[in-house]
């Protein structure tokens, strides 16, 4: 009888404990999923915040790395998880996400400044652990495409073949209604794809900015060839449409019109393809290429960007460094001097690169930035000025006269493809091609 009573007491106590635990669990409410406008305020420093469409940019000056780290802990305690961390020289970058929101933080110790970018979660860039593929040991190459458009002698289109035979495309060029340039791009992809490939695979299409001479080819390519290629993801970060209306209402055959066509193509032809908004500090892994984003337009705030100041699309260009096949390529788009000076100011030895793209077809430049990059090879996108730009401006003259620059390659007269890594013999190249023979329309 005593044993039976003991068993009953144990069962009653067990049920009570289980019930208490259940009640405790049921009473524990899940944390609220914080949206873009619900984030806790950064706890220190002098704060300045700007709303850009669906994105909030907060710049906190007079802060320390401990403040940056403490805010990360605050976000983690509020239901965020760390998506990625990156370190470039002494600068720290962290991306955190929840189901609704992405937060991108940076800390630049030279200015004791923390920047917080909050936006809807959207599609995310590929990290190292996401970059799963099988290399085919195919020679990586870099191709600069000559544009054929008669609208304007401007444009930029680069094609990088990766070691599995897929591609990264950067911009594309002006394009034209006759689809000459988009057909040229498609033919390059077909010719450089592995034998037997039914559809060329574009692992990433990156747009430096939204001017028509950079996105125009994409628009016509999408109409003619969207179902003849496979595209895995798009990467870009354009300024607001309001800025475009203020600064770029007419530029090289109406960039606003071309941007509207760009949006239409994205919606109509690629509704399910990820569209990643990339930011300063993102490290993107695409096959055997690793890309560090060094500058995106949010960092124009507050000096060149606020409720009254609107940057041009050139000023909003991305700057990023591609590491591939043991070499590095610095891409600048049409960036203006402010952006070049920004990366020169905040980055140190990491700017050194083997290949440099001259900014804005050679029309924007910075001696400090170019000398920090200190390239061995220089690429000049399609330019109405041709090689004349090498005689204009201290930055371009520095590149022209630098003893470390072995070759300047331009794409105004022809498409050019080089292997990566690129290490030609001196006998195979000339630093500046002989204008009187190779470029008869140009007198150097």
Task: Set out the residue ranges of the language-model regions.
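Amphipathic N-proximal alpha-helical interface segments
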Residues: 45-51, 97-128, 225
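C-terminal motif of bacterial Sec signal peptides marking the signal peptidase cleavage site
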Residues: 18-20
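Amphipathic alpha-helical segments
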Residues: 62-84
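Active-site metal-binding motif and surrounding structural segment of the metallo-beta-lactamase
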Residues: 165, 178-236, 241, 346-363, ...
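Compositionally biased P/S/T/G-rich terminal and signal peptide-adjacent segments
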Residues: 25-61, 119-126
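Binuclear metal-ion centers of metallo-dependent hydrolases, dominated by the metallo-beta-lactamase
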Residues: 133, 233, 239-292, 298-300, ...
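Core dinuclear metal-dependent hydrolase active-site scaffold
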Residues: 122-200, 275-352, 418-444
């Amino acid at each position: 009888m005593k044993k039976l009573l003991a068993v009953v007491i144990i069962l009653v106590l067990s049920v009570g404990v289980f019930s208490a635990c259940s009640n405790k669990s049921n009473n524990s409410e899940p944390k609220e999923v914080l949206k873009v406008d619900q984030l806790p305020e950064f706890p220190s420093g002098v704060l300045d915040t700007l709303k850009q469409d669906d994105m909030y940019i907060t710049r906190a000056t007079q802060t320390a790395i401990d403040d940056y780290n403490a805010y990360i802990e605050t976000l983690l305690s509020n239901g965020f998880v760390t998506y990625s961390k990156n370190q470039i020289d002494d600068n720290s970058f962290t991306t955190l996400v929840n189901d609704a929101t992405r937060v991108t933080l940076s800390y630049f110790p030279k200015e004791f400044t923390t920047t917080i970018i909050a936006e809807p979660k959207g599609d995310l860039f590929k990290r190292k652990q996401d970059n799963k593929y099988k290399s085919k040991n195919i020679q990586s190459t870099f191709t600069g495409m000559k544009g054929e458009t008669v609208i304007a002698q401007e444009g930029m289109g680069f094609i990088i073949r990766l070691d599995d035979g897929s591609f990264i495309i950067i911009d594309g060029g002006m394009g034209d209604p006759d689809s000459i340039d988009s057909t040229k791009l498609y033919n390059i992809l077909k010719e450089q794809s592995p034998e037997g490939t039914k559809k060329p695979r574009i692992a990433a299409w990156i747009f430096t900015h939204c001017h028509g001479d950079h996105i125009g080819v994409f628009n016509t390519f999408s109409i003619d060839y969207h179902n003849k290629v496979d595209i895995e993801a798009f990467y870009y970060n354009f300024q607001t449409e309001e800025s475009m209306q203020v600064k770029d209402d007419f530029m090289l055959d109406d960039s606003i019109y071309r941007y509207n066509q760009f949006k239409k193509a994205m919606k109509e032809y690629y509704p399910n393809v990820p569209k990643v908004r990339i930011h300063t500090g993102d490290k993107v892994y695409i096959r055997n290429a690793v890309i560090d984003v060094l500058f995106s337009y949010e960092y124009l705030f507050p000096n060149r960007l606020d409720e009254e100041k609107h940057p041009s699309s050139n000023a909003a260009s991305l700057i990023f460094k591609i590491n591939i096949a043991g070499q590095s390529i610095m891409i600048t788009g049409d960036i203006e001097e402010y952006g070049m000076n920004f990366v020169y100011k905040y980055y140190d030895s990491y700017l050194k690169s083997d290949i440099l793209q001259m900014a804005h077809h050679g029309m924007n430049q910075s001696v400090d930035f170019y000398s920090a990059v200190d390239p061995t090879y220089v690429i000049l996108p399609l330019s109405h000025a041709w090689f004349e730009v090498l005689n204009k401006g201290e930055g371009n003259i520095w590149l022209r006269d630098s003893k470390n620059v072995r070759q300047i390659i331009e794409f105004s007269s022809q498409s050019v493809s080089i292997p990566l890594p690129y290490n030609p013999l001196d006998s195979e190249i000339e630093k500046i091609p002989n204008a009187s023979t190779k470029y008869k329309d140009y007198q150097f």
